């Protein structure tokens, strides 16, 4: 109803895949029924770009970091004395760019207070370079699918496709899990990647897979939890 209300005023409805996605589950197979016009995902890492790109929605947009705030999420200075937002942007873009070569994103942007960049002209110059690189990468996707080797990889955990690419948080929130490092590596590799559940295994999905990765902590949903007790 809310989306219909937005459309009735001639506007487009986007969902922010960070603060306001709970309950709409972009990977539950029915997300498209809502009728959103686009999805926005803030990103630090490549796997988050793939998380956004794989959703059934017309427009996929990334909100790049660092945000235009005086301090970052961890409290370190960003757009203030002692901060180096250009270095931050380079670090995050290097990670995100790998994934953009594998899956198409339609738009990129920044969030925060625009006036804060006035004292950081090098940041503005670098973001101009980022925008040019993004347009070039997007133009490659307009020409066709990227090259993939024949290897088909499946990441196996309890959630399966419902939690494709993610461990329910940013990299700095989930870095202690081996699986998030694996997801990040896969996000930029030229292989077909899918996320499967143990129910999928029961229904024969492994016949379409060359490599299975199960890398969650023992006993957790990311390894399969009690699914391993089913013999």
Regions found by a protein language model. Give the residues of each.
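Glycan-processing catalytic domains of CAZymes
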Residues: 1-230
């Amino acid at each position: 109803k809310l989306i219909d209300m937005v459309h009735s005023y001639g506007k487009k409805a986007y969902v922010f895949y960070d603060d306001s996605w709970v309950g709409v589950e972009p990977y539950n197979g029915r997300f498209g029924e809502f009728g959103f016009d686009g999805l926005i995902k803030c990103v630090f890492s490549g796997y988050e770009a793939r998380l956004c790109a794989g959703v059934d929605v017309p427009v996929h947009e990334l909100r790049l970091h660092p945000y235009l705030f005086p301090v970052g999420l961890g409290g370190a200075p960003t757009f203030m004395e002692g901060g180096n937002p250009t270095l931050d942007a380079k670090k995050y873009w290097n990670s995100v760019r790998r994934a953009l070569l594998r899956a198409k994103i339609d738009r990129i942007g920044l969030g925060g207070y625009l006036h804060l960049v006035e004292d950081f002209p090098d940041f503005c110059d670098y973001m101009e370079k980022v925008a040019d690189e993004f347009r070039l990468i997007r133009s490659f996707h307009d020409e066709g699918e990227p090259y993939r080797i024949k290897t088909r990889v499946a990441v196996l955990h309890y959630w399966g496709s419902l939690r494709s690419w993610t461990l329910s948080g940013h990299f700095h929130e989930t870095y202690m899990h081996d699986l998030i490092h694996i997801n990040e590596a896969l996000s930029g590799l030229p292989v077909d990647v899918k996320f499967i559940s143990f129910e999928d295994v029961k229904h024969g999905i492994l016949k379409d897979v060359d490599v299975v990765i199960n890398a969650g902590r023992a006993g957790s949903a990311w390894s399969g939890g009690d699914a391993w007790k089913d013999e």
